[in-house]
């Protein structure tokens, strides 16, 4: 057989939309250009578009970070439900404000890791799709509505929620970097 390696696939893509052939842009990352090109040639379609990057750490970090920040943005949806009722119609200001702050913080974190700008953009696109169509949206809304962590976890029993693990781990890392004088906690209000 042929030995090929792709380190990660990331970007704004939900499987159910891919099944319907919705236009989708993702990135494949790895160190071997020939392997990446082969995968792109093999898997690209008229609706599944693939960018390539050698920035493995940047891409993997971007797609992980989006989970933590999507949780925070989704919580604003729950807050609106709690204060105005679930049938109050669409409220975008708080979501947009939280999304803006999430993008700023993600960019700062990715710069610390020397991620490429392309990986930043992939992470931002992934943040968008996760806020509006992912599992993280569900837990964020429940927490924003005032459910306790335990209540929300009971409601979503059996659902994998990377966002909670990522948020805790990234916050812990930021606190440590702040102790070392490498970052200011004021730059990361959504995490601290």
PLM region descriptions:
Residues 53-56, 60, 66, 71-81, ...:
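NAD(P)-dependent Rossmann-like dehydrogenase/reductase catalytic/cofactor-binding core
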Residues 1-92:
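Rossmann-fold dinucleotide-binding core
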């Amino acid at each position: 057989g042929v030995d090929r390696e792709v380190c990660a696939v990331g970007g704004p893509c939900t499987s159910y939309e891919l099944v319907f052939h919705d236009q989708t842009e993702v990135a494949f990352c790895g160190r071997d250009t020939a392997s990446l090109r082969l995968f792109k040639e093999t898997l690209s379609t008229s609706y599944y578009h693939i960018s390539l990057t050698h920035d493995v750490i940047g891409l993997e970090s971007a797609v992980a970070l989006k989970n933590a920040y999507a949780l925070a943005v989704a919580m604003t949806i729950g807050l609106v439900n709690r204060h105005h009722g679930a049938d109050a119609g669409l409220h975008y200001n708080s979501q947009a404000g939280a999304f803006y702050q999430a993008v700023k913080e993600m960019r700062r974190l990715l710069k610390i890791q020397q991620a490429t700008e392309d990986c930043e953009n992939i992470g931002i696109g992934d943040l968008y799709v996760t806020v509006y169509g992912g599992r993280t949206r569900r837990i964020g809304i429940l927490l924003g509505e005032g459910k306790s962590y335990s209540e929300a976890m009971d409601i979503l029993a059996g659902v994998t929620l990377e966002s909670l693990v990522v948020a805790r781990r990234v916050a812990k890392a930021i606190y440590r970097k702040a102790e070392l004088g490498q970052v200011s906690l004021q730059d990361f209000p959504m995490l601290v």
